[in-house]
């Protein structure tokens, strides 16, 4: 069965390119096997959704502000906005902050990558060039068989 793969070719391509676009069968299972094999060779893995990512570089690697929906809005009475803005915007750690400590390689696995624009995908594909330990896998949708390609090449072809 082709899904019983060792993951060596996938790991080799991931380390060479830094960011891969992954197309997985809709019944699932293959991606978790690949992630488990990468964890076994020392990667610290973080799995999250690409929805609501915003500016990828700031959200993943930099100290940034988090705008809570109910803060920073004007209070209104009887339909008229009155008063000053309420609240302050807290600064939060980058999402990958704790994983960036140490020397082990980091794997960021983004689900639902098909919702990202070409500019967001381009920014994500450039992140491993800035942080060499960071490797990124973006699930780009379903396919009949498991396949992957360089995220940079996918962005260029769009």
Curated annotation (Swiss-Prot):
| Function field | NDH-1 shuttles electrons from an unknown electron donor, via FMN and iron-sulfur (Fe-S) centers, to quinones in the respiratory and/or the photosynthetic chain. The immediate electron acceptor for the enzyme in this species is believed to be plastoquinone. Couples the redox reaction to proton translocation, and thus conserves the redox energy in a proton gradient.
What the entry lists under Pfam families is as follows:
NdhN (PF11909)
Describe its membrane topology. Peripheral membrane protein
Q: Reaction catalysed? A: a plastoquinone + NADH + (n+1) H(+)(in) = a plastoquinol + NAD(+) + n H(+)(out); a plastoquinone + NADPH + (n+1) H(+)(in) = a plastoquinol + NADP(+) + n H(+)(out)
EC number(s) stated in the UniProt entry for this protein? 7.1.1.-
Uppermost EC category:
translocase
**Entry keywords, A to Z:** Membrane, NAD, NADP, Organellar chromatophore, Plastid, Plastoquinone, Quinone, Thylakoid, Translocase
MF GO annotations: oxidoreductase activity, acting on NAD(P)H, quinone or similar compound as acceptor; quinone binding
Its GO CC terms are: organellar chromatophore thylakoid membrane; plastid
Record's subcellular location: Plastid, Organellar chromatophore thylakoid membrane
The organism named in the record is: Paulinella chromatophora
Question: What name has this protein been given in UniProt?
Answer: NAD(P)H-quinone oxidoreductase subunit N, organellar chromatophore
Q: Quaternary state and partners of this protein?
A: NDH-1 can be composed of about 15 different subunits; different subcomplexes with different compositions have been identified which probably have different functions.
């Amino acid at each position: 069965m082709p899904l019983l793969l060792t993951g060596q070719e996938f790991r080799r391509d991931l380390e060479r390119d830094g960011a891969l676009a992954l197309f997985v069968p809709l019944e699932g299972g293959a991606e978790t096997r690949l992630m488990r094999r990468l964890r076994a060779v020392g990667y610290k893995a973080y799995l999250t959704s690409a929805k609501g990512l915003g500016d990828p570089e700031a959200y993943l690697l930099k100290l940034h502000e988090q705008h809570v929906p109910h803060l920073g809005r004007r209070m209104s009475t009887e339909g008229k906005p009155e008063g000053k803005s309420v609240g302050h915007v807290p600064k939060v750690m980058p999402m990958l902050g704790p994983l960036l400590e140490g020397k082990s390689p980091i794997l960021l696995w983004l689900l639902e990558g098909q919702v990202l624009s070409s500019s967001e995908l381009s920014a994500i594909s450039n992140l491993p060039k800035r942080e060499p330990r960071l490797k990124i896998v973006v699930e780009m949708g379903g396919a009949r068989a498991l396949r992957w390609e360089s995220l940079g090449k996918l962005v260029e072809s769009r």
